[in-house]
């Protein structure tokens, strides 16, 4: 228990405490320079960083963008993941371990590498399949870029969520299925009336993790932004936070970046809690 507690404190609690502390400070000139500038020093600014973050229109625009992205991507990914899990849990598929591994492999690919691979597939000059699509197809146009990113993350995380559903399905007593078959239920009826209702908890977990992951969307837009300057450095909240930290966006530094990150965590938590409460109310109805 002690090693776990030490790791929990070092890996989880300490970064949160450091981030909270940093959010109340900003780097300002000391005033000791020849023209009043001088060395940058950490100065306590109270809630100023949070006020700046909360009133920054670019932050809320990027947040609205990822919320729209989540509304497009999460339902599709969860539906596909559940469908694959139901298929692997049935007696239709032989060698389910092989299929399980093949579906999970995209998740094992590092995020940046996967994003670069999709950038290659989306680039007209080098893509092997774009020449076969209708002329004018552009996966990186302003009107299609969210769908393109949704496709990238769905490819990556469907296998991961499939394993969550499959673990829940395999925990269901097989006696329930046998009893249903004796009563004349078809495979489809067993799936819809027994399996799907019993994996509601797994679905809740998968959606909550997806919501949190969506707020942190970073790899895909960063890689695509390198080839599409119109996206800007604040296309997603995570990009805005990172570029604020790196001095690409003003006000910059660890203080404003920490305020953005804590605001993102608060929004992700609120969205997750609201979804969980809605699902609980639906389950009690």
List the model feature ranges, each with a label:
Residues 1-285:
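A structural signal for multi-pass alpha-helical bundles of membrane permease subunits
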């Amino acid at each position: 228990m002690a090693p776990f507690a030490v790791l929990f404190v070092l890996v989880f609690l300490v970064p949160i405490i450091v981030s909270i502390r940093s959010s109340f400070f900003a780097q300002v000139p000391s005033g000791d320079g020849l023209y009043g500038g001088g060395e940058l020093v950490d100065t306590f600014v109270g809630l100023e960083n949070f006020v700046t973050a909360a009133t920054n229109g670019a932050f809320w625009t990027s947040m609205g963008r990822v919320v729209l992205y989540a509304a497009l991507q999460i339902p599709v990914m969860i539906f596909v993941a559940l469908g694959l899990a139901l298929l692997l849990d049935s007696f239709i598929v032989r060698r389910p371990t092989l299929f399980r591994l093949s579906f999970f492999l995209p998740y094992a690919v590092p995020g940046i590498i996967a994003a670069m691979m999709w950038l290659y597939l989306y680039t007209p000059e080098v893509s092997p399949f774009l020449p076969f699509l209708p002329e004018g197809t552009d996966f990186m146009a302003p009107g299609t870029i969210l769908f393109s990113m949704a496709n990238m993350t769905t490819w990556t995380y469907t296998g991961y969520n499939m394993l969550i559903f499959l673990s829940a399905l395999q925990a269901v007593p097989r006696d329930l299925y046998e009893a249903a078959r004796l009563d004349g239920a078809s495979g489809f009826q067993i799936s819809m009336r027994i399996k799907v209702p019993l994996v509601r908890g797994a679905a809740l977990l998968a959606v909550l993790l997806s919501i949190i992951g969506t707020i942190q969307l970073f790899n895909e837009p960063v890689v695509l932004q390198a080839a599409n300057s119109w996206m800007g450095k604040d296309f997603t909240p995570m990009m805005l936070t990172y570029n604020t930290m790196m001095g690409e966006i003003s006000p910059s530094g660890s203080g404003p970046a920490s305020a953005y990150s804590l605001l993102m965590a608060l929004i992700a938590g609120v969205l997750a809690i609201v979804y969980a409460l809605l699902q609980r109310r639906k389950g009690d109805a």
